[in-house]
Amino acid sequence: MSEITHHTDYRQAITAIKQRIQASQARAVMAVNAELLNLYWDIGRQLDAWQRERAWGSAVVEQMALDLQASYPRMKGFSRTSLFAMRQFYAFFSPQFEVVPQPVGQMPWGHVRTLLAKVKSVELVLLYAQACFEHGWSRTVLEWQIEQRFHERVGQAV
């Protein structure tokens, strides 16, 4: 049986299968990430509406965070700070978008939070999100590119 592993056809076949598995895993991660961002958008939308309509303040958000953490102890991301970040995420984009904008929906949540903290215009956030997707930037690289004013260099190249 081990002799087969030395044949070129076999090595090509196993390589093709491994590549297919890796591609499928990458798509699954992206799908999960996109769904999480949709969840965070919806939570942010609800928090925004409740705070405007019911004048709920930070004490209510604090209690929600505690209740969510108790209900989902193995899940991260439901701290008071995270809930406020979800509201900020929604509030930042909702004047122009009804759903999570496409390039942003392909980014990890940490990247999104970095952009919201460091970039003030929707247009620039979308530019950085697209660049992250195209170039596969880590969060550290994204932060560096923002500090180096990547958007100005790209603007000069266009």
Predicted regions and their residues:
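Basic, low-complexity intrinsically disordered segments
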Residues: 1-158
